């Protein structure tokens, strides 16, 4: 039966490649697809939806980690702690808008001193004339 099935002596089964590696991503496309299906967000989930969502999540994570790493380096630290993530998110305009209602545990608050509480500048005051 020529042309049907595998030929004798073929190389065997192909090595399985994950959808994440096919898309060039680190985030798990299969797990995100499973969560989308189990979450009942829709009756059916397209093949490209979990890949796209994984890519978006990976981009956001990379962006936050890069900014948090910069904040850690500015503070002369080698380990990123929640404080560095808080500083990174709140100093970035777009991330701050996206995560405006999010509370980061152990993140602290942004340093802010009201202008009225700052000491007066010496050169700003005019000398009084008699």
UniProtKB/Swiss-Prot annotation:
Query: Gene3D superfamilies, from UniProt?
Result: Histone, subunit A
Q: Name one GO biological process term.
A: DNA-mediated transformation
Cellular localization per UniProt:
Nucleus; Chromosome
- Tissue and organ expression note: Low level of expression, mainly in dividing tissues: floral buds, margins of newly emerging leaves, expanding leaves and the meristematic zone of root tips. Also expressed in many non-dividing cells of the elongation zone of the root.
Q: Which domain of life is it from?
A: Eukaryota
Q: Give the UniProt entry's GO cellular component terms.
A: nucleolus; nucleosome; plastid
Q: Where is this region: Disordered?
A: 1-23
Explain the post-translational modification: Not ubiquitinated.
Q: Any signal peptide, and if so, which residues?
A: none
Q: Which UniProt keywords apply?
A: Chromosome, DNA-binding, Nucleosome core, Nucleus
Relate the induction remark in this record. By phytohormones. Transiently by wounding.
Q: Which Pfam families match?
A: Histone, Histone_H2A_C
* MF terms in GO: DNA binding; protein heterodimerization activity; structural constituent of chromatin
Q: What job does this protein perform?
A: Core component of nucleosome. Nucleosomes wrap and compact DNA into chromatin, limiting DNA accessibility to the cellular machineries which require DNA as a template. Histones thereby play a central role in transcription regulation, DNA repair, DNA replication and chromosomal stability. DNA accessibility is regulated via a complex set of post-translational modifications of histones, also called histone code, and nucleosome remodeling. Required for the T-DNA integration step of plant transformation by Agrobacterium. May play an important role in illegitimate recombination.
Matching PANTHER family: HISTONE H2A
- Report quaternary structure and partners: The nucleosome is a histone octamer containing two molecules each of H2A, H2B, H3 and H4 assembled in one H3-H4 heterotetramer and two H2A-H2B heterodimers. The octamer wraps approximately 147 bp of DNA. Interacts with VIP1.
Similarity annotation? Belongs to the histone H2A family.
The molecule here is called Histone H2A.6
Specify the species: Arabidopsis thaliana (Mouse-ear cress)
